[in-house]
Swiss-Prot record:
Its EC number is 2.7.7.12. It catalyses: alpha-D-galactose 1-phosphate + UDP-alpha-D-glucose = alpha-D-glucose 1-phosphate + UDP-alpha-D-galactose. UDP-alpha-D-glucose binds at A63, N79, D80, N169, Q184, K329, F330, L331, V332, F334, E335. This is Galactose-1-phosphate uridylyltransferase. Its cofactor is Zn(2+). The lineage of its organism: Eukaryota, Fungi, Dikarya, Ascomycota, Saccharomycotina. Pathway: Carbohydrate metabolism; galactose metabolism. The active site is at H182 (tele-ump-histidine intermediate). It comes from the Eukaryota. The modification Phosphoserine is found at S27. InterPro entries: GalP_UDPtransf1, GalP_UDPtransf1_His-AS, GalP_Utransf_C, GalP_Utransf_N, HIT-like_sf. The keyword Metal-binding applies.
Length: 366
């Protein structure tokens, strides 16, 4: 087969992810195969405005006995079942007299920190695409305020906070244990592996090309258009060239902003707007409450000069659904043992999302 005959939309190929320094196998011809495997339960929008049994609804008692205030906007509280804690002893360093083989292979670090729950709305049955944009601005404001507060706690009170990972798991398909719209923030004294790898990649790219990786990538995607889903003055949303999940997207700041702490009011409103449009498109794709895991990647708290210089605010959305509201992608077999693989090309996925309404939610048309 000659190069002229190769078709990216039909033939297998590998794509490089410069953020993680890894490759993904793309097999577009597999999208036509029949599916007889597991199917997720289709989402039925039957949740009430208020659930007296919900641990996150205003005025309700949580499992620990703590009482929620009757909050009317976003509400943040320390996670009752935090993955990391402040009140634990520091692990001593390995004894240098121990077996060298053990020291080389069995490495361990103590990790302290704090975790928070971020209730997006007092309404039990509202997800991000169904909220008013003004409510989404409140969410963005809460992300910024939490980032600033944790940075100040580390700086002034010497709390062991180095990085805050803000994220949301939406839907039971993503392991969400409570359907009340909420996200989380885990603040650790170390930089998580995914973020650390990105920072290394950003640093390497800048040293080799004397510019920022995302500056070049935003320029490239704006020029090619084929992977762009939606954009506004401050942000561009793309299905990345190297996407693993079928309808994975990147929300990237068009200008270099290292952290949400640097956002002015206009940028915060633009982020709220782009998130609403993107998530409406997601829900409209299969006319379901589209599950995903999403999160912010930004500069570490009280970043060093190099960390600040290398960081560029962006958000990852990882939705599992593949071809319908009930058929999801699984990372198994070759993808666990070899490398990730996808069927639908990034360009095909972006076209589907781009052509969907990003203003009117499908439930408004019922």
């Amino acid at each position: 087969m000659t190069a002229e005959e190769f078709d990216f939309s039909s033939h297998s190929h590998r794509r490089y992810n410069p953020l993680t320094d890894s490759w993904i196998l793309v097999s577009p011809h597999r999208a036509k195969r029949p599916w007889l495997g597991q199917q997720e339960a289709a989402y039925k929008p039957t949740a009430p405005l208020y659930d007296p049994k919900c641990y996150l609804c205003p005025g309700n008692k949580r499992a620990t006995g703590n009482l929620n205030p009757r909050y009317e906007s976003t509400y943040i509280f320390p996670n009752d079942y935090a993955a990391v804690r402040l009140d634990q002893p520091i692990l001593p360093q390995n004894d240098s007299n121990e077996d060298n083989l053990k020291n080389r292979l069995l490495k361990v670090q103590s990790v302290r920190g704090n975790c928070f729950v971020i209730c997006f709305s007092p309404n039990h049955n509202l997800t991000i695409p169904q909220m008013k944009q003004s409510d989404l601005v409140h969410i963005v404001n809460s992300w910024q305020a939490l980032t600033d507060d944790l940075s100040r706690e580390a700086r002034e009170n010497h709390k062991p906070f180095k990085y805050v990972q803000i994220f949301e798991n939406k839907g039971t398909a993503m392991g969400c244990s409570n359907l009340h719209p909420h996200g989380q923030a885990w603040c650790l004294e170390s930089i998580p592996s995914e973020v650390s790898q990105e920072l290394k990649s950003f640093d390497k790219y800048k040293r080799e090309h004397n510019t920022d990786l995302f500056a070049d990538y935003v320029k490239l995607e704006s020029r090619e258009k084929s992977r762009v889903v939606v954009e506004n003055e401050s942000f561009i949303v793309v299905v990345p060239y190297w996407a693993i999940w079928p309808f994975e997207t990147l929300v990237i700041s068009k200008k270099k902003l290292a952290s949400i702490s640097q956002f002015n009011q206009m940028v915060k409103e633009d982020l709220a707007s782009i998130l609403k449009q993107l998530t409406i498109k997601y829900d409209n794709l299969f006319e379901t409450s589209f599950p995903y895991s999403m999160g912010i990647h930004q500069a570490p708290l009280n970043a060093t000069g190099d960390e600040l210089s290398n960081s560029w605010f962006h958000m990852h959305f990882y939705p599992p659904l593949l071809r319908s509201a009930t058929v999801r992608k699984f990372l198994v077999g070759f993808e666990l043992l070899g490398e990730p693989q996808r069927d639908l090309t990034s360009e095909q996925a972006a076209e589907k999302l781009r052509n969907l309404d990003g203003q009117i939610h499908y439930l408004q048309r019922l």
